[in-house]
């Protein structure tokens, strides 16, 4: 940049008069482009959902780099040295929290040293506990299971709260962009409100006795709590937890007892026993849902993912 400015001064001083006007204009545009680029807020994200929200809120003022990408299993993901470098070169790091990123504490020294602002979605939502086998999420419960459910994005209300959190973080590091962030956030908030209404209109089509979700792992607790479903997960909170043979037998019995119509696979990882459970219970495959983050195609955005999941669930359980 310094070299460009020095050459410009020489041209402006008359050394190259024929080039003066054109080069001055070109140089000015280059300097403005470089300056504008320097103002872009670099955001690293450990959550595909939060990355999507960040793009909607930040627009052209932010550059979002996904450390955890669609299709990855975030339960077993570990950041590489290259990921550490990407994070340390960012202004903001987005994380789900509530134990979803088991390595997050190891990242904190890197964040503090580099001055990276950490935004943890789980800090602004009301966490629920992971489900016991056959646990009903349709109401509030006073007992605890000892582990919090980190899949807060399965509630649209929670996502609205986290979107506001991201907006506030952007304003804190880039006050000049406040108007842009507020405007984009308001537009997103309205869309999420419309999404929440749409979800409820779909769910009311299901008789309450049909609102039983058999899924690969316990990731739809917030969805179940919002819309009155019972969850029968094959695995626990994490995809790395393998069910015991006793749990599988108990689950088969519960599914048969409740007359469950469909069993749902997940987009990332499914336990081998899922096929066995489907065969022994006579329940049909209900389709694939996205539990741990976004996918591709129609599920490549948060709104698209929720619409896909809800449509899949309602069609299978009618």
Task: Annotate each language-model stretch with its function.
Residues 22-33:
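Bacterial N-terminal signal peptides
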Residues 38-318:
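Extracytoplasmic metal-acquisition and chelation regions
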């Amino acid at each position: 940049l310094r070299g460009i400015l020095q050459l410009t001064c020489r041209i402006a001083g008359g050394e190259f008069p024929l080039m003066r006007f054109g080069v001055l204009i070109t140089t000015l545009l280059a300097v403005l482009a470089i300056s504008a680029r320097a103002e872009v807020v670099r955001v690293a994200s450990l959550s595909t959902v939060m990355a999507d929200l960040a793009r909607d809120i930040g627009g052209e003022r932010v550059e979002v780099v996904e450390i955890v990408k669609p299709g990855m299993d975030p339960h077993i993901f570990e950041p590489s040295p290259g990921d550490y470098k990407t994070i340390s070169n960012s202004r903001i790091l987005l994380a789900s929290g509530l134990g979803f990123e088991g390595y997050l504490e190891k990242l904190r020294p890197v964040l503090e040293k580099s001055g990276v602002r950490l935004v943890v979605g789980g800090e602004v939502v009301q966490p629920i506990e992971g489900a016991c086998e056959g646990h009903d999420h349709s109401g509030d419960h006073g007992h605890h299971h000892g582990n919090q459910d980190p899949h807060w994005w399965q509630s649209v209300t929670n996502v609205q709260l986290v979107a506001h959190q991201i907006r506030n973080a952007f304003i804190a590091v880039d006050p000049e962009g406040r108007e842009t962030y507020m405007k984009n956030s308001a537009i997103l908030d309205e869309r999420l409100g419309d999404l929440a209404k749409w979800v409820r209109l779909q769910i009311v089509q299901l008789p309450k006795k049909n609102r039983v979700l058999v899924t690969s792992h316990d990731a739809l607790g917030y969805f179940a709590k919002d819309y009155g479903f019972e969850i029968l997960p094959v695995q626990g909170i994490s995809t790395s937890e393998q069910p015991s043979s006793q749990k599988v037998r108990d689950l088969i019995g519960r599914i048969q007892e409740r007359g469950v119509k469909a069993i749902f696979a997940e987009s990332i990882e499914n336990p081998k026993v899922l096929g066995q459970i489907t065969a022994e219970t006579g329940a049909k495959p209900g389709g694939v849902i996205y539990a741990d983050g976004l996918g591709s195609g129609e599920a490549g955005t948060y709104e698209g993912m929720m619409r896909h999941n809800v449509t899949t669930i309602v069609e299978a359980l009618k």
